[in-house]
């Protein structure tokens, strides 16, 4: 897969210095075990600095989570890459993201040419993310709603990416996963979380695998404007 962006490199801030820091980030991701070239190309291409506050722009290509307001964060690049790599293994076409946040994870998926549906419970974050999607020419379908219920109208999905942690996998989301599809989500509480992938077999059986220890904000119910 080749990342798809409408803007020219200069429009997304790929100057000499910016390209070097992106290259270094990709090399760090390789060293940390990310091997899927499509994922790495998307991580190199999508301008992470556009998804954070300007005051933090100098840290945009560090492999660390950063605050985006409302008690939320933009995930660590390694985590974004690992979740993306995991869902690409089932060759998805249609993906549901639960927790739009800054829009960065959704942008990575959209840059890979996937049909992306994303749900965010915090209205202000969703409005900002939509502006970024438009700026980058990305056709990401978004909804202001309680992410725990998913987006049933457009299901089932080949892949589901959950960007906030619940004590257990949410049944309503698992039910929206297509046969042969994969769901990747952080599971656990404040003190201990694991990144879990769940794959629905052709016979409907569910296979679950723990990928890595992680730290995410909690998956909450309800909506905020």
UniProtKB/Swiss-Prot annotation:
Q: Which GO terms describe its molecular function?
A: protein-L-isoaspartate (D-aspartate) O-methyltransferase activity
Q: Which UniProt keywords apply?
A: Cytoplasm, Methyltransferase, S-adenosyl-L-methionine, Transferase
Active-site positions, per UniProt?
Answer: 75
* UniProt xrefs under CDD domains: AdoMet_MTases
The UniProt entry, under InterPro entries, shows:
PCMT, SAM-dependent_MTases_sf
Q: What chemistry does it catalyse, as a reaction equation?
A: [protein]-L-isoaspartate + S-adenosyl-L-methionine = [protein]-L-isoaspartate alpha-methyl ester + S-adenosyl-L-homocysteine
The first-level EC class reads: transferase
Q: Name one GO biological process term.
A: methylation
Q: Where in the cell is it found?
A: Cytoplasm
What EC designation does it have?
2.1.1.77
Q: Name one Pfam family in it.
A: PCMT
GO CC terms, sorted: cytoplasm
Q: List the disulfide bonds.
A: none
Stated role: Catalyzes the methyl esterification of L-isoaspartyl residues in peptides and proteins that result from spontaneous decomposition of normal L-aspartyl and L-asparaginyl residues. It plays a role in the repair and/or degradation of damaged proteins.
Q: Which family does it belong to?
A: Belongs to the methyltransferase superfamily. L-isoaspartyl/D-aspartyl protein methyltransferase family.
The record's listing under NCBIfam families reads: pimt, PRK00312.1
Q: What is this protein called?
A: Protein-L-isoaspartate O-methyltransferase
Organism of origin is: Xanthomonas oryzae pv. oryzae (strain KACC10331 / KXO85)
Gene name in the database record: pcm
